[in-house]
Amino acid sequence: MKHFSLLFIFLVILLATSYSDAFTRNSFPKDFLFGAATSAYQWEGAVAEDGRTPSVWDTFSNSYDTGNGDVTSDGYHKYKEDVKLMATMGLESFRFSISWSRLIPNGRGLINPKGLLFYNNLIKDLKSHGIEPHVTLYHYDLPQSLEDEYGGWINRKIIEDFTAYADVCFREFGEDVKLWTTINEATIFAIGSYDQGTAPPGHCSPNKFVNCSTGNSSTEPYIAGHNILLAHASASKLYKLKYKSKQKGSIGLSIFAFGLSPYTNSKDDEIATQRAKTFLYGWMLKPLVFGDYPDEMKKTVGSRLPVFSEEESEQVKGSSDFIGIIHYTTFYVTNHQPSASLFPSMGEGFFKDMGVYIIPTGNSSFLVWEATPWGLEGILEYIKQSYNNPPVYILENGMPMVRDSTLQDTQRIEYIQAYIDAVLNAMKNGSDTRGYFVWSMVDVYEILSGYTTSFGMYHVNFSDPGRKRTPKLSASWYTGFLNGTIDVASQDTIQLWSNFSVSSSL
């Protein structure tokens, strides 16, 4: 054990001194928010309790063998314990989502009083501990009743129902909520759910990779994406007309943003990378900032890409007070077919239209991501230059590790340090970034990997009916950073080990 301790201390020293610039919490503005995140289906559990009805995520997860969110971290019953952990950590903000089918079980109409009570209690508990709630209205979990009735996000009826749902949330919770995200990672939501079939409700054209029972990959992602933008804009308009002057909050949309870098120095790969940015970033950002889709997308996708009316264009333009960024890693982009590509560019859908090949960096794979903080810095610089430097929140950033592998998650610490440093560098270069959220606060059910990997700073024992929480080393590091007791690039990190019991084990 002594040999292990010395080896670990050496690794921590190496980790703590591997960055050129020291930074602390005080290196960031006082109003910059450091937080952590979860989502309703992934954290709450209690899927059949107190009036909640099934969502499309319940249906989707029960169709596969990667587990489900029936109990998961049991946040519904353990939220007070988790809020205390956040307060001890010094967390400044907690991002969570509201389960539409818990609050309004039929998707529209009567409010579930027990669902309303749960979210009011959670929000007030956060506020009483000085933690700012950042509330996401939609995170992959459409009430199954609306999917069954009219097809959900591929039907324009969703705009009215989503706006009515948002109205309930603004009215009931808005006095205590200053940050709202309408729809989570809109780009990858439309692609994963309506092209690739890898996210609920699992639509895609027939292919050899995923067995979808319905869908059209060449049209549905664009229809869903269009309705996402219109639903967001409608909810945003409602908030600004009815609530903003009194509640004084902000409302935004989030996108999933891979870092994108040319695979070679060739002109072809540079052009391919710009094309990928146009499709993966510009698809949502250009309408939000300028009121219409990128010309290259309109030319390529043609009549399959819906058209904004003049009124819709004006409503979408400027509808986001901020842009939320979901980012985990970076991929190389090439114009020429490589031996291994992450996403198939041939097929019927989005990636065929994009017409480039995406290659993992280093040892990255679909579920294991290499730390590439320069990729996030590049995204923030690109958004600054291309989209009028809007306010940005990094709403998810974290590192997956094999579940139950270790509490000494030094790789995760290194990852978080590097990405916070990248955010600081981008801000020094003028990016209007205003917050950073680690995914995830505690171990949760993951959308792609179920319970095989975990991102949490707190380990959750999913075999224990009580879902015991145990801090990982990353929780201790984040606590030290937020409380000003760790100066990155100094050797203060060594103190973590002396405070983190050698006997701490799973």
From Swiss-Prot:
It comes from Arabidopsis thaliana (Mouse-ear cress). Disulfide bonds join 204-212. InterPro entries: Glyco_hydro_1, Glyco_hydro_1_N_CS, Glycoside_hydrolase_SF. The lineage of its organism: Eukaryota, Viridiplantae, Streptophyta, Embryophyta, Tracheophyta. GO terms for biological process: carbohydrate metabolic process. GO terms for cellular component: peroxisome. Glycans are attached at residues 211, 216, 363, 429, 461, 483, 499. Keywords: Disulfide bond, Glycoprotein, Glycosidase, Hydrolase, Signal. It comes from the Eukaryota. This is Beta-glucosidase 9. The keyword Phosphoprotein does not apply. A beta-D-glucoside binds at residues 42, 139, 184-185, 328, 396, 439, 455. Residues 1-22 form the signal peptide. It is an enzyme of class 3 (hydrolase). Pfam families: Glyco_hydro_1. Belongs to the glycosyl hydrolase 1 family. Its EC number is 3.2.1.21. One of its GO terms (molecular function) is beta-glucosidase activity. The keyword Disulfide bond applies.
